[in-house]
Amino acid sequence: MFEARLVQGSVLKRVLEALKDLITEACWDLGSGGISLQSMDSSHVSLVQLTLRSEGFDTYRCDRNIAMGVNLNSMSKILKCAGNEDIITLRAEDNADTLALVFETPNQEKVSDYEMKLMDLDVEQLGIPEQEYSCVVKMPSAEFARICRDLSHIGDAVVISCAKDGVKFSANGELGNGNIKLSQTSNVDKEEEAVTIEMNEPVQLTFALRYLNFFTKATPLSPTVTLSMSADVPLVVEYKIADMGHXKYYLAPKIEDQQEGS
């Protein structure tokens, strides 16, 4: 039996919004330690890894490990029926072919009960190696989303150049080019408004903006985002989910563009 109750149900709604445009179906791994998901996107270019720890839920019970195949569009549609203030409970029997979703208003006066059909999915687990990164940039998540959105009007790829004093985002396209430079902030009252850079060596890498714009759908999950980069390994875009876990997106750099000198 699996049952998880989340008083702040809007977190779960935001998690689905962050996933559903990138991956259509995925296997949710339910265990005593929490819920996790790992999936390549449908074009096998990027990877998503999500962790929601059991202690982040208000009550959590999972008697045995369950792999639950879920159509994320279907789950998102059902979660849209929950109000932002609703308490959400997820429930499944051990060998169930459905997941129950229960939404309660805070005053308990309205209870909505949905059942979603589960899928049989063959999922290969990819090992994600632990990695030391040359540059780690932490910045406001809304700022990163804005940069990706703005530069996607200029070109379809962004060059991210990271140095000790700042990080630069550049794009080239038919209409010209655009460059946005963020300097490391020296003193900020609110930590979530800071730009901090930890650099072992400078990095300049090119990434497809189409995927970064998918990743930034996770912006409502966290006020900050962390970008971890090294030459020849995938970029990691990480959003911390307060007290619960994280969503990490991995995207390999574009190589052919760099050889053409762009």
Curated annotation (Swiss-Prot):
Residues annotated to bind DNA: 61-80
Q: Which InterPro entries match?
A: DNA_clamp_sf (IPR046938), Pr_cel_nuc_antig (IPR000730), Pr_cel_nuc_antig_C (IPR022649), Pr_cel_nuc_antig_CS (IPR022659), Pr_cel_nuc_antig_N (IPR022648)
Q: Say which domain of life the source belongs to.
A: Eukaryota
The terms describing its cellular component in GO are: PCNA complex; PCNA-p21 complex
Q: Which Gene3D superfamilies match?
A: 3.70.10.10
| Reported modifications of this chain | Monoubiquitinated by the UBE2B-RAD18 complex on Lys-164. Monoubiquitination at Lys-164 also takes place in undamaged proliferating cells, and is mediated by the DCX(DTL) complex, leading to enhance PCNA-dependent translesion DNA synthesis.
Q: Is the keyword Transcription in the record?
A: no
Q: Which GO terms describe its molecular function?
A: DNA binding; DNA polymerase processivity factor activity
Protein localization: Nucleus
Main localisation, per the record? nucleus
- Where is the Glycyl lysine isopeptide (Lys-Gly) (interchain with G-Cter in ubiquitin) crosslink found in the sequence? K164
One GO BP on record is:
leading strand elongation
Which key words tag this protein in UniProt?
A: DNA replication, DNA-binding, Isopeptide bond, Nucleus, Ubl conjugation
Q: Which CDD domains does this chain map to?
A: PCNA
Q: Identify the Pfam families for this entry.
A: PCNA_C, PCNA_N
Q: PANTHER family annotated for this entry?
A: PROLIFERATING CELL NUCLEAR ANTIGEN
What role does it play? This protein is an auxiliary protein of DNA polymerase delta and is involved in the control of eukaryotic DNA replication by increasing the polymerase's processibility during elongation of the leading strand.
User: Record's family?
Assistant: Belongs to the PCNA family.
HAMAP family reported for this sequence: DNApol_clamp_arch
Quaternary structure (record): Homotrimer. Forms a complex with activator 1 heteropentamer in the presence of ATP. Component of the replisome complex.
Q: What is this protein called?
A: Proliferating cell nuclear antigen
Its taxonomic placement starts with:
Eukaryota, Metazoa, Chordata, Craniata, Vertebrata
